[in-house]
Amino acid sequence: MEKDGLPTYAAAANQPASQPRRRFRKSRSLKVIAVACLVYLAYAQWHQRSIAPYRTTTLSLERLQADLATCAKLQHKPQDPAGQRARNGRYIEGHKPTLIKNATVWVGEPAAGTSAEDAHAGKGYSWVQSDVFLEHGLIKSVGANIATDSLPSDVQVYDAQGRPLTAGIVDMHSHAGVNPLPQLRGNEDTNEMSADITPYVRSIDGLDPLDHQIQVIKSGGVTTSLVLPGSGNNIGGEAFVIKHAVGRPDGRLEVSAADMLADPDRSWRYIKMACGENPKRVYGKAGEHGPTSRMGESWEFRHAFEQAAALVREQDDWCAAAQAGGVDAVETYLPQDLRWETLGAVLRGQVHVNAHCYTVPDLEAFVDHTNEFKFPIRAFHHAHETYIVPEILKRAWGGRPPAAALFATNMDYKSEAYRGSERAGAILHDAGITPVYVSDNPVLNAQHVVYEAAKARGHGLPYHAALAGVTSAPAELLGLGERIGKVKPGYDGDVVVWDSDPLSVGAAPAQVWIDGTAQYGEPFLLNKTWSVPSVDPSVDALLTAPSEEVTLDSASANIVFTNITTTLHPSFPPAALSPGSSAPNVLIITAGAITCLGPCLPHLPHVLHTHTTIPLGRFGGTFTPALTALGSALGLSEIAAEPSTRDGVNTPTSPFARAVDGLLATGSKQLAAARRHGVARAVAAPLGARGVGVGFWVAGEGEGEEGGEVWGEEVSVHYALGRGAKEPSLSAAVGELRGRLLEAVEGLNGTGKETETVVGRYDEQAFLRRVVGEGLALVVHVDSADTIKALLRVKGEVEDALADVGDALAGVDGDEGKANGTRRIRLVLVGAAESHLLARDLAAAGVGVVLAPLLQYSQHWDQRRSLTGAPLTNGTAIDALLDAGVDVAIGASPSETWEAGWLSGGWVE
């Protein structure tokens, strides 16, 4: 068979019938290619989206860029602002420079080359004779004999006349401005009570620059304060550091909280937290949200930090993505939550934490929180038990133990303060913990916060550490240690010239400068003599060593006190002492009676063999009468905030009580403290100041015996006519007292003695009849000058009624109340903040005054006209009262002996 019949491949390809098939195949290939391209594009887009998330067009590029800039702020690590500057950021153009000549300067740091160990011990510190030049809001130079011809022609010269000059006082716990004085409901902004955790509130938003207390505080040399929210909740909010210069009179251009900021750049932020009793008391109520125990408080803290930590993580993740790939790399805005912003800054190390914590459990729990969430704490405030557990403080996160911001002697007012010690500062200093001293204004008047440091020194804290505790130490804790707290070139021009050693009792500023501007045009100045105090650590140790209490049976006590240097006893004037050193002065007590004061040379050979000798050391001692405490709850209350430790409070509707029936004197820490401070006797009124006062001995007669022995069961009749008496009104309370006194006058019989039944022996009228008929003291607790004026009218009306009794009172026992043949009731005012306004009237009426406390301030409305003393006022209430001839005493306080010292410290001539 031939192969010609078979088709060939070439022939088949050339046949015309095959052309349409060829066109079809080419079209399909193009489609395949197109599909492949589409697949590739889809894949590329998918792949691109897997690399960088797709950003929707709804996000604002401008806002994303702002968020990216915020990342830098979040990651910023603050540093203490440097001191060396051309001018202070708070300086106001046009203020003249000032040269302070002839000052005795406390620089605030040891001499160059002093080792850290020696500096801690107090070596290298000294007062130096120097001039200080202030310009552009700064300390420009410190040195001897600065020549005025080297200074600007418009320089102002202030002659310090050798007086001491220190840096301005720094109080790192104050509520000035947010708790203005006098306290009123409408201006109280210390605590935000809407929740237990309020880190988002700010003290500056409630700060009133017109709070007069800001000026009063400055008059004590305080130039800078940390204004904190209160301690009513566990996290109270953000705090701010202010200077005490407000408006044009103080050299400022405006009246505003912003203008008061100590560091306008706000290098650091601050926050207040609190542990313990306060949050439990405020929020610990059944059925309501809030902690009822310290366990609950720890949960509140940890839960809050957990929320803040979550926000920080989200922000860090967002910032990492945006910083790596730009704003196109993020799909959302930066996570932000104003509620947790401040706590987030705490966890980032941008906020100095200050925590109100008293007790060992509180301190230990809070230290645990710092380690769990990795944030530092700057200081524990109040901190009454820190001296017991310094090792716990040293476990706080960050490697730097927190400081302890303390009161010197204000303690025992509630359970968590009951273990406090007057030597806490000295103990903490020895343990390597920094003690600083604060006011908690208005709890204590910050005008006298330097006085807290003085008391700490008296209880063993070395001189340099005590003065640092209100200057350089708080400045450093605030992160402003190169700006304030020392007298060095480059520091802010915040300095104080004092009328005496600032750590002496009664010291007051002669002038205060803030940012180089003098704050007083014509300050009142107390003329005092002073000598440069020794700051040698060995001498300081002798001066502040704790004294041993000596208790001997008064009936058989045979004692010789050697080296008496001063006497303030009215029966033993200074003339009894020998001024020479060849014959040291001694005080001889034989069988419990004083037998000699002075050199006593004829007595010494005998008594040195028969008496116990008690040397008073190298610096000697002062002989005073024992003190009598009046005006406190001593003997009736152990812990003010714990009802179970108190006798209880009497109200206007309570039965008339006798304090002797509620005396709580056995095993009292309060009585022991009073005894250590020289108090021998006390007069206590029923709590609420309505009833009959009792007189008792603070110490027992024999060694180791408890106090509380009564020397007078019924020594006075007490009423209160202050804020608590306005039920229903103060006028009604005054009228009721008038009526009862007049009723008592009518109850006298012809002999002037009270008519009573056995049952009525202890009722109110019986005691008031003794007031009007026998001279029993009527003690009224009152502050307002208006109420005092009303009392003077009542006194006159009652005495007129007594005059009507006429001869019926002739020969009555107890003639102490008679004057010029007219019976007078013995009226004594306690508190008496505004008594100086009626000094002459009080003297004419024969009214005695017990100032309690001695140094009053306008804490309440009826104290608003108190005199604060130099440099603001020419004296205090006691000056006006003594000048008018009023009999004046000082009321009991936690530091009664220190307050008595103000009288000999130059505040009263």
Where are these regions (language model features)?
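Histidine-rich, glycine-flanked metal-binding segment
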Residues: 46, 51, 70-74, 80-85, ...
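Divalent metal-coordination and catalytic microenvironments
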Residues: 103, 132, 137, 162, ...
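Short, low-complexity, Lys/Arg-enriched N-terminal segments of secretory-pathway carbohydrate enzymes
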Residues: 1-25
